[in-house]
């Protein structure tokens, strides 16, 4: 963990919110996700609480208040690190939500708390102790670390990536934002991180389209087939909608039947919502100034955008 200083990628802003205001609103859990104009603060907490305020690239970002207990409290300080957990073997045998509905009631009762907890972490983020320090990761970061397989297996926890995801969550929370431009070093994991976010968004969003562009059409296709599709296929059944077509599509990944949230209240039900299509797709296009012209996108991944080959120009495409 870095010590604070002018070369850090973030700083913790002390006493940014008056203590009496912080205490009152935390008790009532009335801090709202999004931009808070009064305090010029982007709140990424989704549980109504506010804890530390980070400043990242001159943007004030409010994290949730840390809990009193952590999953790895039972470990010695020097052994407290991020650890991904394998899906329980019995749940690996279930491939679709339909197989879950056919499972015996006692089996569902045994595993519903685990599944509910995973949905909560995906939505609200996750706390753990890192060498004794309470550490918050966003839900998107959790999905990357826990449920994404990359070329070397599970991703490592990196503090720089944590800050990236905090800033990205602020971009999503702030309705004034058009997105994020990220300049990176090699092997930083961005292609996998952005692919993970594309799949994460697609599997929870209805009637949306997610696009991929890269420096060439061949690179965009490779990102789709080698990263996006495997990430989707490796999701556990409770996060994975039913998709149209092949398991390994080459041009479009189409989600139809959604993976609705499993809770104690609905774990025995087969409601009509499971049969309504998501109608969300992920696809890629050849690199061109007018790629995706006139098409509404929920999320556009521009990979290697600084390497477009002439005569194509990323600036022209951005104006489309």
What are these regions (language model features)?
Residues 2-320:
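Phosphate/NTP-binding elements of NTP-utilizing enzymes
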